[in-house]
Amino acid sequence: MDTPPMPSLLWHKPGVAIDANIQTFLAADDVLLDREFFLYDITASTAHAQALQRIGLLTPDELDNILRELQHLTDEYRNGTFLLDTQYEDGHSAIESRLTERLGETGRKIHTGRSRNDQILVATRLWLKDRLTQLSTLNRDIAHHALQRAAAEQHLPMPGYTHLQRAVVSSAGMWWAGWAESFIDNAVRAADTHALIDCNPLGTAAGYGVNLPLDRPHTTAALGFARLQVNPICAQLSRGKFELAALEALGSATLDLRRIAWDLSLFTTSEFAFITLPPEYSTGSSIMPNKRNPDVIELMRATHASVAAARTEIEQLLSLPSGYHRDLQNSKGAIVRGFKRGLAALELLPALLSRLQWRPDTLRAAIDPGMYATDAAIEAAIAGIPFRDAYQMAAKTADTAAQGRTPETSLTARRSPGAAADLCLETLRARWHTLTQPTSDPDPR
């Protein structure tokens, strides 16, 4: 079915009919996804208008009028007066349509020297910078809570497991310190990824530049980018690749979230009974009155699947030659879904970590005699017996290895750096304090 073109179709050619089904397929849910990026798009349009005025393509009065209308559009979008919906093909066309509606010919100048390609590149780049800043902050917060608990509970004995089998005497402090260091690593990765993508693609147009002396250094500074993304072809190559890098940084954190949630899921079972969760982190059963289910940590555990799925979707989209291809439109939905689920789950973790309670008696009772066998083997090796012989001796006497030993003496003896008697918390704290917190301009929302 052919229908008259929407006024917001920037690419429409006179005399060419628009098939409604094809247009629906092309647009998909693009305009709805652009609600995530719309205010960033307006911010970039402001910088672009300033750059046009600096090379004489807008008069000072025209610039003032455009900036005023862009601010009005921002205000109306925030308060719900302006609705970005399917009457527009996408957020870019909505901005140009509004400026044209309010300013006539002046509004029609806003797209001079830019393409929707670099327009969405810069909007998503600003969006990703903010999300990576949030991710870095969350990683730092999680590490901070874990460090606090490591210091408070470094002498609390608990079983250490390999293969989900009891292995050696460990401590709650060591468990906490392990997560602290891992989330410090995650914060570093988020900051490094922020630095990678902190470059300005605006002004690269459709991927080959334009025959205008665009003031790209101005837009770089105005938008708070650390540097210019120089080559237009590289700018197009970075679409999807930078989104993939951001999701990998997020996935590093949600992978650890999945594993700590696994630990907590096990530790809350009656078979382990190592911890007690705050009541608001569990729900009841619809049929079994006796049940309290750890649904929150189970859904935390499941979050990484959503992030990994988003990453895989973008990776598959990138099976492309150089230059822009419409396939890349689908990368927007992937990053929105991935970051929405990932950040929401990570936001719940600091409070949970600060409030869960260990059950010391149960922890101690789970330490069986065989868990001292490694200590016995190493002590024999220190006394001069070759370790492999000491190992065999300790294996034969594992059932009685606890004689003369306590969990505390085992922990005290583990003096290798990072082990229970020397958690190196000051080293971890120093590393935490030197984390580079990425900065972004205030979120335009």
Swiss-Prot record:
Gene3D superfamilies, per database record: Fumarase/aspartase (C-terminal domain), Fumarase/aspartase (Central domain), Fumarase/aspartase (N-terminal domain)
Top-level taxon of the source organism: Bacteria
Assigned protein family: Belongs to the lyase 1 family. Argininosuccinate lyase subfamily.
Pathway info: Amino-acid biosynthesis; L-arginine biosynthesis; L-arginine from L-ornithine and carbamoyl phosphate: step 3/3
Its EC number(s): 4.3.2.1
HAMAP family assigned to the protein according to its UniProt record, in alphabetical order: Arg_succ_lyase (MF_00006)
GO biological process, one term: arginine biosynthetic process via ornithine
Keyword terms: Amino-acid biosynthesis, Arginine biosynthesis, Cytoplasm, Lyase
GO cellular component, one term: cytosol
Protein name: Argininosuccinate lyase
One Pfam match: Lyase_1
Claim: Cytoplasm is one of the keywords in the record: yes
Location within or outside the cell: Cytoplasm
Catalytic function, reaction form: 2-(N(omega)-L-arginino)succinate = fumarate + L-arginine
GO MF annotation: an example: argininosuccinate lyase activity
